[in-house]
Structure formats: C-alpha cells, structure tokens
Regions:
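Non-catalytic DNA-recognition/assembly elements of restriction-modification systems
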Residues: 1-7, 29-62, 185-231
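Short coil/turn segments at secondary-structure boundaries
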Residues: 22-23, 64-72, 159-162
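Extended non-membrane alpha-helical scaffolds
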Residues: 47, 71-72, 112, 138, ...
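Acidic, glycine-rich low-complexity/disordered segments
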Residues: 15-18, 46
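Short amphipathic alpha-helical segments
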Residues: 38, 130-132, 174-178, 198
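A short beta-sheet element
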Residues: 81, 99-155, 159-173
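Sequence-specific dsDNA recognition surfaces
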Residues: 32-38, 52-69, 75-107, 127-135
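Glycine-rich, mobile lid/loop segments that gate access to catalytic sites or pores
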Residues: 3-4, 8-15, 22-29
Length: 232
C-alpha cells in the first residue's frame, strides 16, 4: 500500500509522471498552467471536474441478524462488515437477494461511520450499512479514483467533515464538495495498468498469509497433543 501511495504522490501531486520521453514531467520542464479551482498549477491540457462526474455513491440495506449464518452456504453471500478488514474472526453470510449490491475484491468501499472516509477493498460480497460503494463510471479510472480517495489530504478532509456534521456519517454530500484533476487518457491507462498489478500482488500476499495462519492454527494443537510430530 505504501508503494501505491508513493506512486500516486509522484504522478499526481508532484506531477512527475513519465512524459513521452520517459522523464518526470514537471521536473523536466513540462508545461504547467494555473487552475483557479484548485489554486495551483496543473499540467497543460488536464482538466478539473467535480468528483461526482466520475463516480456515484451506493448504499446497501441491513438484513436482520436472524438471517446471519457463520459458515458458507448455498444461496448465501459473504456479508462484509468494517471489522472484517482487520480480522477474519467474525465471518458472516446472508441470503443472496436481487436487492443486494455485490462487490468484487477490486471495488472501492468507504467507511461511513467510525473511521469515516477510510478506503476499503479486497473482500467479495455484500456490504453492510456502515460502508458505501464508490461506483466508478469508467473502469479505467478505478485505480486513480481509489488512490485519490485514499490520499492523506482527501481522507482527512472527508473524515473531519463527517465528524463536524450532526450525524457523523459519510455520504454522497461529502463527496459532492470534492473536485478532481482529470489527466489525459494515456496517463490514466498507464496508471491503471501499473496500479492494478500492485493490487493483485497485495491481495495475493494477503491470501498466502491467511493460508499460513490457517495451517498454523490447524497444525499447532496436533503438535502440542502429540497427534503430529516434526521429522528430524
């Protein structure tokens, strides 16, 4: 994750993305123009638009707890809760219905309460009411939008604006305040391809870690009670 943040900062905060010669754009004298909305210089021919021109916000309903089951079951789907991003100890499943919004592992979710504004991904299923989905209209923009929302400045802004409200909840109204720089199509595609490979690697490493933990938890009791031994 730190590597992804550094690349975003380099490309879209410092504007030192690779130019047509493979050199850092801004540091190599690439033309910058003043943008009145952002009160700063941005690369020539880049635009600034409201974030909600590129994304929409989606929420889910909360099923009754009586429908929860705690083992995989046909016709059921993983129920994603905020705590699942920190621990796998409370995995829950709910009936799959046509009214549920289902996300894949690369879709963007955000915390609405608690750590409001935190960006989440990596679990497939139906998300609960404490999370909101960021629906990116153009799939080629997904990694750029994820990085934008996950940047320190945007997270702090969204979190603080939620805490200042009477309901202390992230909503589409918070996102409506944000403007975002729109790079040219080549930069967007290059960034999407580059970052997607990093996300795949991150999820693969997480999966391997979970497998090792499960193996340890299965093997350790047998070693302790003598059901299994380690050969010399």
């Amino acid at each position: 994750e730190q590597q992804a943040k550094l690349i975003y900062d380099y490309w879209f905060t410092q504007f030192d993305f690779p130019d047509e010669n493979g050199k850092p754009y801004c540091s190599s004298g690439g033309k910058m123009v003043w943008n009145e909305q952002l009160k700063r210089n941005i690369p020539e021919n880049w635009n600034v638009v409201p974030l909600l021109k590129l994304v929409s916000w989606e929420s889910n309903s909360q099923p009754p707890k009586s429908e929860f089951v705690y083992e995989p079951k046909e016709g059921y789907v993983r129920f994603i809760q905020n705590r699942d991003y920190d621990s796998d100890t409370h995995i829950t499943y709910i009936p799959r219905t046509k009214n549920l919004s289902i996300v894949d592992r690369f879709d963007i979710l955000m915390d609405k309460y608690g750590d409001a504004g935190a960006v989440r991904y990596g679990i497939e299923g139906a998300f609960n009411v404490a999370l909101g989905k960021i629906c990116v209209h153009n799939p080629n923009y997904r990694e750029y939008i994820r990085s934008f929302l996950g940047s320190d400045g945007i997270y702090k802004f969204l979190h603080n604006s939620c805490m200042a409200s009477t309901r202390a909840s992230l909503s589409e109204a918070n996102l409506a305040i944000l403007n975002i720089v729109v790079p040219n199509e080549k930069i967007i595609l290059d960034y999407e391809n580059f970052l997607h490979k990093i996300r795949v690697s991150i999820l693969k490493n997480k999966d391997e870690t979970v497998e090792l933990i499960n193996l340890r938890d299965w093997l350790l009791p047998m070693l302790m009670n003598g059901q299994a031994t380690i050969a010399d």
